Each structure stands twice: as structure tokens, then as C-alpha cells.
A protein has these predicted regions:
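Bacterial N-terminal signal peptides that target proteins for export
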Residues: 1-8
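Hydrophobic helical h-region of N-terminal Sec-dependent signal peptides
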Residues: 9-13
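A short, solvent-exposed, low-complexity linear motif enriched for acidic/polar residues
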Residues: 21-235
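C-terminal motif of bacterial Sec signal peptides marking the signal peptidase cleavage site
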Residues: 17-19
Length: 235
């Protein structure tokens, strides 16, 4: 019986350690389109100066998303009209002080055959983001229209920004936007700020690119806008 107190103490210590180790390690993230700091829904009309703009399709790839030293997602297909592709959850191994990702598909995955993936895979041909064996995946697929008169109508300027090719892969480091460590239980909001993305684009003369020779400079300009078009908030 003289060993009973020690046994009780040991049992309590074990329970205490177990309870301390059962904290929530889940981190969730929403990818959100915004325009002038307000959430943007595909099909909504917004304004760049006096020009009316409407995005009607908005698809893009994010790759190599790292929170701290942990690679949480190799590739993500984001369809702004499908919330299941804009919301994610991961189990975070440790607190993290950095956040990094790239826009597009890295060169290894860009060389893959899309028909080799299951329908639910981000790189599946079902997502209709693959051009051909020569040009490979589209990194961005943005379709819409604009009108400098301020009213959309029959004389709209069509917008088609389709970029791809390995050299247009762009990476984004948002570590400097973190006020503190990312930890289990946090909800991250990754904002794609469309007003920042299009601010240096001419909606009249730079409205079309398929990353081909005759419009490649527009694809490069769009791609170079990407690192400054994302914002990270932690809730």
C-alpha cells in the first residue's frame, strides 16, 4: 500500500501530459478573391476607374504551399466558383513563422500526362486546364469582359488571360505579413487581390493572351503582377 500514492501521482502526471498533447493541430485556409478589399464573386461587375469589368471564369493553380518547414499541399486547383476548391485543412506539425507558395504548376508536374490522374486530382484533365503536350498546363485561366464606357453591353472588350509554360511559374513569400506564428486552430485567409493584379494592365490593349509568341509579353506582365497580388490574414 505504501506505493499507492506514487502510483496515483504517476497516473495523474500521465493524464496531464496526454491532455497537454491533445491540442488542436488543424489549420484551415480559405482562398478568397477580393476587389478593393471586398470579397469578389465571379460574375460581379466592378470598376477600374471608369471602366466596367466582369470576370466570368476564374481558375488558377497554386503549388508547393509551405507553412514553416512543412509542405502542406503539392498542388491545388482553385475554381473561384467551387468553394470545395477554395477551402483547405491541414494538420500542422509545429508552429510556423513562414508562408510560401507558387502560382502555376512546377516543371515536374507540368510534364505529366493529365489523363494519368484520377478525376478528383487537381491535375486531372477533367479540370480542362491542360493545353497540349507542347504547351502543357494553363496556370491561370481568366475570362471576362470590360467596357470603358462604364456599362457592359454589346460592345464589350472580351478578356482572356490564359498563361502557362515553365518560365511563367511565379513564387510568393508572404512571411512578412505574419504578425505572429501560425499555429493549430488558426484560420488563414489567402486573398487574391484582383485590383492589385490588374492595376498595371490595359484592359483595352492587353486583354488577350494565350502565352503564344504574338501575345507572350502580356502573359509575362500578368505573371509578374502575381507576387504583389496576394495578401494573408490569420484569424
Amino acid at each position: 500500500m505504501k506505493y499507492l500514492p506514487n502510483l496515483v501521482v504517476a497516473s495523474l502526471a500521465t493524464l496531464l501530459l496526454a491532455s497537454c498533447g491533445n491540442g488542436d493541430s488543424t489549420v484551415s485556409m480559405e482562398v478568397r478573391l477580393t476587389y478593393n478589399d471586398a470579397p469578389y464573386a465571379v460574375g460581379e461587375t466592378v470598376y477600374k476607374g471608369d471602366t466596367a469589368v466582369k470576370f466570368e471564369k476564374f481558375y488558377f493553380y497554386l503549388s508547393d504551399l509551405q507553412i514553416g518547414d512543412q509542405l502542406v499541399e503539392e498542388v491545388m486547383f482553385c475554381n473561384a466558383e467551387d468553394s470545395t476548391t477554395m477551402n483547405y485543412e491541414w494538420s500542422l506539425e509545429n508552429k510556423a513563422n513562414s508562408f510560401f507558395f507558387c502560382v502555376g504548376v512546377d516543371s515536374l508536374n507540368n510534364a505529366m500526362d493529365p489523363t494519368s490522374f484520377d478525376v478528383g486530382h487537381p491535375l486531372s484533365s477533367a479540370n480542362d486546364m491542360y493545353w497540349s503536350w507542347a504547351t502543357k498546363y494553363r496556370f491561370l485561366r481568366i475570362d471576362g469582359r470590360s467596357n470603358p464606357s462604364g456599362t457592359l453591353g454589346t460592345d464589350d472588350i472580351l478578356l482572356a488571360w490564359h498563361t502557362g509554360k515553365d518560365e511563367l511559374y511565379r513564387c510568393v513569400d508572404l512571411t512578412s505579413q505574419l504578425a505572429g506564428a501560425i499555429k493549430g486552430g488558426d484560420h488563414l485567409i489567402l486573398e487574391f487581390e484582383l485590383d492589385q493584379f490588374i492595376q498595371n494592365m490595359s484592359l483595352e490593349t492587353e486583354s488577350m493572351t494565350h502565352a503564344m509568341a504574338d501575345d507572350y509579353d502580356i502573359a509575362v506582365k500578368l505573371s509578374n503582377q502575381l507576387p504583389g497580388a496576394f495578401n494573408l490574414r490569420v484569424e
